[in-house]
Amino acid sequence: MFEMYIESGMNKLRCGYTTGSCATGAAKAATMLLFDLINSEEELNEIEIDTPKGIKVEMPIDNVVVGKNFVQCTILKFSGDDKDITMGLEIQARVEKIRKEEAEGLSKKLISNESKTIVLDGGIGVGRVTKDGLFVAKGEPAINPVPRQMIIKEIESILPKDKYVKVVISVPQGTEIGKKTFNPRLGIEGGISILGTSGIVYPMSEDALKASIKLEIKQKSLKSKNLILTFGNLGENYCKYLGYKEEEIVICSNFIGFALECCVSCNVKSIIIVGHIGKMSKIAYGCFNTHSRVCGVRLEVLALELTLLGYDISLVNKVLNEKTCEGAVKLLGSGYENLYENIGQKILNSMKTYVYDELKIDAVMYYGASNPILLWSSCLE
C-alpha cells in the first residue's frame, strides 16, 4: 500500500493517488491477467505503476472480473488526507483483446498509441467534452493528456508482441459525482474527469483548485472576452439574479489575484467582480488571497473608512466589536452610501494597480446570504 507523507505546519499529512493513477493501475493489472503475465488473479492483490513525478505507487486491486476475451480490474480512489469528492470511487479498466484490423479502425475515432496496438475510451461515469478550449478535444472522453500517456505507457511495457487491446475506463458512480464538480461548468457532461499531472494527490494543496480556475477562465474566454468573477456559489447565484450569463461567470474562490492574472494571460478585455463586502473589503486594501488564514482584515476596513469620513469614534468601536462585516452593515443600517462608495473605489483602484491597467474592471458589492442586497456598484444602474 502506498504511503507517502508531507509536512504541513505541525502536521504530517498522507498523500494519495489520482484518478489517473487508479485508471493506469487498473488497466495494467487487467492486461497482465488477460495475457497470463501472472499465474492467477489471486496472486495479483496489488499493482505498481510509475508516476510522472518519478515516484512508484502501489495500489490494492479491489475487484477482478474475468470474461471470455476480457478482464476488468477495479481500484478504489485514495486521496490520502485530502478528502476530496472522488475519495473511495471505483475506477475500473476493462481490457479486451481485439484484432489488428479492429484496432486500426477504432484508432481513427478513439485515443490510440502510435503503433495502434492500444485504443482507449471512456465508459460509464467518465465525462465527455462538449466544448472547445480544454486539454481534451471536443467529443473525446475526459481522460486528460497525462493519464492517457500513463495508461498507454504501462500497457505498452507489458503487452505481448503483435497483440492488440481496447481499454475502457469507467467510474460507476461518476455520473452523479460529476455533477458536483467543476465539470458541468467546463462543458464536460456525464461524469468525472480522469485527472492528474503528477500521479500523486498532495493534501491541502491549492494547485488543483487553481488549475480548475485557470482552465475555466481559458475555456470561457474563448467565447467571451468579458467575464464575471465571483467568490463562490452564493455569489454565482447573485450574478445570475443580476442577469449575467452562466457561460461568463467564473468562481475564483479566494484566489482573486490569481484569477486576475489568468484573465490577463487569456487576453480577457474586461471583468466585473461580484462579491460580498466581507471578501471585497480585503481587496480594497491589497489582499488578493482572501482566505481568512492569509488576510483577516475586514471590519478594520470599515472602521478606517468611517474614521476617514469623520464619523464618531463610538460608532467606529461598535463596528470593530461586531463579529462579521454582515453584522457591521446591519448595525449601520441605511444612510452610509458614502462609506460603500469609498470602499468600492478603493477596490477598483487596487485591482487596476494589480493588473497594471491591462483590464477594464468594474465591481458589484453586496451583503446578505439568502437574500443578497446591493451595497454599491460601478456598473449597474
From Swiss-Prot:
Query: Which species?
Result: Clostridium botulinum (strain Alaska E43 / Type E3)
- Which family is it part of? Belongs to the CbiD family.
Transmembrane ranges?
A: none
- Keywords for this protein: Cobalamin biosynthesis, Methyltransferase, S-adenosyl-L-methionine, Transferase
For the keyword Membrane, the answer is no
Offer one example of a GO biological process linked to this entry: methylation
Q: In which pathway does it act?
A: Cofactor biosynthesis; adenosylcobalamin biosynthesis; cob(II)yrinate a,c-diamide from sirohydrochlorin (anaerobic route): step 6/10
Q: What is its EC number?
A: 2.1.1.195
Q: Which gene encodes it?
A: cbiD
**Where does the source fall among the domains of life?**
Bacteria
The record's catalysed reaction(s) read: Co-precorrin-5B + S-adenosyl-L-methionine = Co-precorrin-6A + S-adenosyl-L-homocysteine
Entry keyword S-adenosyl-L-methionine: yes
Protein name stated in the entry: Cobalt-precorrin-5B C(1)-methyltransferase
Q: PANTHER family attached here?
A: COBALT-PRECORRIN-5B C(1)-METHYLTRANSFERASE
Q: Which GO terms describe its molecular function?
A: cobalt-precorrin-5B C1-methyltransferase activity
